[in-house]
UniProtKB/Swiss-Prot annotation:
This is Proteolipid protein DM alpha. It is found in: Membrane. The lineage of its organism: Eukaryota, Metazoa, Chordata, Craniata, Vertebrata. It is a multi-pass membrane protein. Keywords: Membrane, Transmembrane, Transmembrane helix. The chain crosses the membrane at residues 19-35, 71-87, 117-133, 204-220. The keyword Membrane applies. Highly expressed in white matter in myelinating shark brain.
Amino acid sequence: MGCSECCVRCLGGVPYASLIATILCFVGVALFCGCGHEALTGTEKLIELYFSNDFMDYALLVNVIQVFQYIIYGTASFSFLYGVLLLAEGFYTTSAVKALFGEFRTTVCGRCVSATFIFLTYALGVTWMGVFAFSALPVYIYYTMWSTCQMVKYVTENGTGFDDICVDARQYGILPWNASPGKICGLSLAAVCNTSEFELTYHLFIATFAGAAATVIALLTYMMSSTYNYAVLKFLSRDDCCTKF
């Protein structure tokens, strides 16, 4: 067997769908965890500097942010390990196995492992869909605030109704209704709109949302490829076929 033929056979056994899904999963989780962590920190800073004069008003929010940040640490570690395991399982069920070990023979244990990965990937996919939907909430809040900032710039140019434009963090449940001041208007709002912290935090939440979307797509790709491979292992292993998905 020549070197070129060997390379062709090796490339033919690569689970490209699983490989692409692994890369997409790593990128998505990295975006979600890294940007989400910094966005939460930026949110805490904005609340502290502009929306509340008393720490007790946002003490619960600080605790919630810390809990989410710890969850992010665990999510990053678990997703990296699970992505590697899924990629290894994809390689196991490709033509590379048949090329190395001859006729495709699978054990009951091997099929059970594949079925387990399908179930876990499905459960994780549903969970990440919920995370994806939840991560849209801060994007909506910051988009509303950004839209108000654009209105402030327009009103500033016209010079009327400047002090009537406000952003109230209490209406989103971020702060209790007895928080003081809880909202910012006029010059204070314009000052916040011009800060780099606000722009950075807004874009970080957008990146977090995009990372969650990428992770959902990766898990759906994993699920399709794992289901296809399992079908081949269970029903078509007696035929002269192999998986390349």
